[in-house]
């Protein structure tokens, strides 16, 4: 799994914390430091919005303005049973 993020993004930190807490391995890609990665996000999503997760080739934004981190969707997409 890849996580497209920036260092200054609070929502990116929350998404990575969720993954860490559930033992999900990922590769972080900083779109501020990698112009090709930034262009990749733009190509797939239509705008430079982070965080973006790529799970088995599928792009997913785990955050929505006004809703915060989409925990239910994360549990489902990652196959994590909810307590």
Model-derived regions, located:
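Rhodanese-like catalytic fold shared by cysteine-dependent sulfurtransferases
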Residues: 43-44, 80
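Thiol-based oxidoreductase modules, predominantly thioredoxin-like and allied folds used
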Residues: 23-38, 47
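Local sequence-structure signature of Cys/Sec-based thiol-disulfide redox active-site neighborhoods
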Residues: 1-25
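Non-catalytic, surface beta->alpha helical segment in thiol-disulfide oxidoreductase systems
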Residues: 55-83
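Nucleotide phosphate-binding site architecture
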Residues: 10, 32, 61
